[in-house]
Swiss-Prot record:
PANTHER family: TRAF-TYPE ZINC FINGER DOMAIN-CONTAINING PROTEIN 1, TRAF-TYPE ZINC FINGER PROTEIN-RELATED. Keywords: Acetylation, Metal-binding, Phosphoprotein, Zinc, Zinc-finger. The modification N-acetylalanine is found at residue 2. The modification Phosphoserine is found at residues 191, 278, 320, 326-327, 409, 415, 430, 470. One of its GO terms (cellular component) is mitochondrion. It comes from the Eukaryota. It holds the Pfam family TRAFD1-XIAF1_ZnF. Negative feedback regulator that controls excessive innate immune responses. Regulates both Toll-like receptor 4 (TLR4) and DDX58/RIG1-like helicases (RLH) pathways. May inhibit the LTR pathway by direct interaction with TRAF6 and attenuation of NF-kappa-B activation. May negatively regulate the RLH pathway downstream from MAVS and upstream of NF-kappa-B and IRF3. This is TRAF-type zinc finger domain-containing protein 1. It comes from Homo sapiens. Residues 217-236, 401-582 are annotated as: Disordered.
Length: 582
């Protein structure tokens, strides 16, 4: 029976997509098409009566706690494997956290330390699982690590310290004093090159210890040279090692001894390891492009040529000689200026070479030459150096004050109306008249005549004043003669006295007395204000006529003589106005 069932043939149902036996296929097909339907979403057969329940239970959209929308039948799998907010356990402290915060927590939690009970060392929590494998072995390794023998140390230093020696060689190559400067100026610069060394660093005991260390260094290098196999360029590296050790040992040495030992060692090293070899041969050993300096004609690498020419240029080193500007501190000799320049260059470069300065390496800062003396300085120090540089020219004067003209240099402008006013106001007192009056009052005391003194001398005084004011005076414009205005009684007395003087001579006992200037007013003064209405003139004329009617005949005669003299004055004033208008 089982064999019969296995050997029977099957057919695929078009509705439910299942294999149906052939002998039962017809009945299944009729039942399947009537009662069973295919789910359009999951392509699974379900009874048509349960299709709505299946769609609501399996294929409806739900939202996860991570705000992701998906079908309900996939929610469980998403929460277990894909949701970022699912809970996970920390591998160090067994604390449940979300996946988003788990990594940050594990990094912090694993960085804690716990004391190991076996070796007594503090071990990181994240290394506790692997620590038992290495527990107790680290102490044995440290005990096995003995101090490095001097030979091994020298070998490692000789291989790894070539870079340091090359840096020292570059500084020596960039240094001009070993090749160009004589030894005498360098020795003259002892006090300035090492000016920052204290007296405690210049004692004799330091020199002895440094020399002993130097000899030990030489013996050790000779020992290493004999033990190491000969290789190409060995002598060069040994020479560089010797120079580096020498520069390091010279720190804190006295200025004169350090300078002499340094240059002597450099010369001896060149003679012993290369014979007549010079620094130019060392420069060419690196197969670099060498170009000559246009000032000193020495060969320098291409990348160092610009910096060297900037410092080697005599026009930059001696700016005061080229521009002709005078320094406010006095004009110095060219030799003195050049020596100052060499002194600054030697002090800056020797300090960096001998290790006496705590400045940073050249590679870490920008080196810019001073625009006055040409000395190369760091960018941070350049501003302060140029402010106090000896070669700095005099500060220019303020041009603002120069542009303002002086008051005394401006031409005095005179109004064109002034001469015309002077001509019109013929009654104005001239400056000459006032000066004469002041001089006469200063020469003799002025006092009023007493009542008992006869007024016989008034005529002489009046004539003298009229003569002094009528004459031309240099530097002053001519003014019309001023006639003193007297009262009626005085005029009568004067007229009577003149008549008496014609008949007889003046009494010798009388002295001419000048009245004060306040009592002498010109009679023909013209007011500067505009005249009033005609009515006022009419009234004044009537009143004046009334007053004139009461004047005595003597006073009238005196005024008539004065009126006769006025037309000539007015005629002269009119001529002056015509000349000014032309």
């Amino acid at each position: 029976m089982a064999e019969f069932l296995d050997d029977q043939e099957t057919r695929l149902c078009d509705n439910c997509k299942k294999e149906i036996p052939v002998f039962n296929f017809t009945i299944h097909e009729i039942h399947c098409q009537r009662n069973i339907g295919m789910c359009p979403t999951c392509k699974e057969p379900f009874p048509k009566s349960d299709m709505e329940t299946h769609m609501a239970a399996e294929h409806c959209q739900v939202t996860c706690k991570c705000n992701k929308k998906l079908e309900k039948r996939l929610l469980k799998k998403h929460e277990e494997t894909e949701c970022p907010l699912r809970l996970a356990v920390c591998q160090h402290c067994d604390l449940e956290l979300s996946i988003l915060k788990l990594k940050e927590h594990e990094d912090y939690c694993g960085a804690r330390t716990e004391l190991c009970g076996n070796c007594g060392r503090n071990v990181l929590v994240k290394d506790l699982k692997t620590h038992p494998e290495v527990c107790g072995r680290e102490g044995e390794e440290k005990r096995n690590e003995v101090a490095i023998p001097p030979n091994a140390y020298d070998e490692s230093w000789g291989q790894d310290g070539i870079w340091i020696a090359s840096q020292l060689l570059r500084q020596i190559e960039a240094l001009d004093p070993p090749m160009r400067l004589p030894r005498r100026p360098l020795r003259a610069f002892e006090s300035d090159v090492f000016h920052n060394r204290t007296t405690n660093q210049r004692n004799i005991t330091a020199q002895v210890s440094i020399q002993n260390n130097l000899f030990e260094e030489q013996e050790r290098q000779e020992r290493n040279r004999g033990q190491q196999p000969p290789k190409e360029g060995g002598e060069e590296s040994a020479n560089l090692d010797f120079m580096l050790a020498l520069s390091l040992q010279n720190e804190g040495q006295a200025s004169s001894v350090a300078e002499q030992d340094f240059w002597r060692a450099v010369c001896e090293a060149d003679q012993s390891h290369g014979g007549p070899r010079s620094l130019s041969d060392i420069k060419g050993a690196a197969d670099e492009i060498m170009l000559p300096c246009e000032f000193c004609e020495e060969l320098y690498p291409e990348e160092l040529l610009i910096d060297h020419q900037t410092s080697c240029n005599p026009s930059r080193a001696l700016p005061s000689l080229n521009t002709g500007s005078s320094s406010p501190r006095g004009v110095e000799e060219p030799d003195v200026i050049f020596q100052n320049f060499l002194q600054q260059a030697a002090s800056n470069q020797l300090d960096s070479l001998m290790g006496l300065s705590n400045s940073h390496p050249v590679e870490e800062s920008i080196i810019i030459p001073c625009e006055f003396c040409g000395v190369q300085l760091e960018e941070e120090v350049l501003f302060h150096h140029q402010d106090q540089c000896d070669q700095r020219p005099a500060t220019a004067t303020n041009h603002v004050t120069e542009g303002i003209p002086r008051l005394d240099s401006q031409p005095q402008e005179t109004s064109p109306e002034l001469p015309r006013r002077r001509v019109r106001h013929q009654g104005d007192l001239s400056s000459g008249y006032l000066d004469d009056t002041k001089q006469e009052t200063a020469n003799g005391p002025t006092s009023c005549l007493p009542p008992s003194r006869p007024i016989n001398n008034m005529t002489a005084t009046y004539n003298q004043l009229s003569r002094s004011t009528s004459g031309p005076r240099p530097g002053c414009q001519p003014s019309s003669p001023c006639v003193p205005k007297l009262s009626n009684s005085d005029s009568q007395d004067i007229q009577g006295r003149n008549r008496d003087s014609q008949n007889g001579a003046i009494a010798p006992g009388h002295v001419s007395v000048i009245r004060p200037p306040q009592n002498l007013y010109p009679e023909n003064i013209v007011p500067s204000f505009s005249p009033g209405p005609s009515g006022r003139y009419g009234a004044s004329g009537r009143s004046e006529g009334g007053r004139n009617s009461r004047v005595t005949p003597a006073a009238a005669n005196y005024r008539s003589r004065t009126a006769k003299a006025k037309p000539s004055k007015q005629q002269g004033a009119g001529d002056a106005e015509e000349e000014e208008e032309e």
